[in-house]
Amino acid sequence: MVSFSYKGNLIEIIEGDITDVNCEAIVNAANPSLMGGGGVDGAIHLKGGKTIDLECAELRRTKWPKGLPPGEADITSGGKLKAKYVIHTVGPIYRGQEEDAETLYSSYYRSLEIAKIHGIKCIAFPAISTGIYGYPFEEASVIALKAVTDFLSNKEGYIIKFVLYGQARYQTFVSLASDFLMAYNP
């Protein structure tokens, strides 16, 4: 684990399984149906159990009948997970267009806004959209760091954890974060 101070907040980078992270909330790289899928989404639904499935079904029924739009976020309990909450967000399917970056930024930023509304100060993120959705990892990492630091720019006391699966992604993210935070943390 590597950690950085940022304007009265803490940014941690961890290699591991996001479902095992100790944090008030973990972020799910969901699909629009909110009903589980592969990767992080499938792992969260599997480990979190029926409670998450039922709460997601209720969100679909009452709030998102056409599915959770890309760049938007919503919240459920954490079910059987260590985290008390799961913040579900849908990242973009990468097509190499400017809107992809805007949508990915929004996925991170909206997740943080949802956390703030619920008084959550410890949030763990996976690398949204970098799996089956095909977003280039390094580009997505810089967007994630930008969204998080923009959100934290006038706040204190937050702990943001980036949880990366695999040593190569972890090392790449640590290097990018170090460069990014040195440039944007006067």
Swiss-Prot record:
Top-level taxonomic group: Archaea
Kindly give the SMART domains that the UniProt entry links to this protein: A1pp
Specify the Macro domain's residue ranges: 1-181
Record InterPro entries: Macro_dom, Macro_dom-like
Similarity section: Belongs to the MacroD-type family.
Cited NCBIfam families: PRK00431.1-6
> This chain belongs to which protein, by name?
Uncharacterized protein TV0719
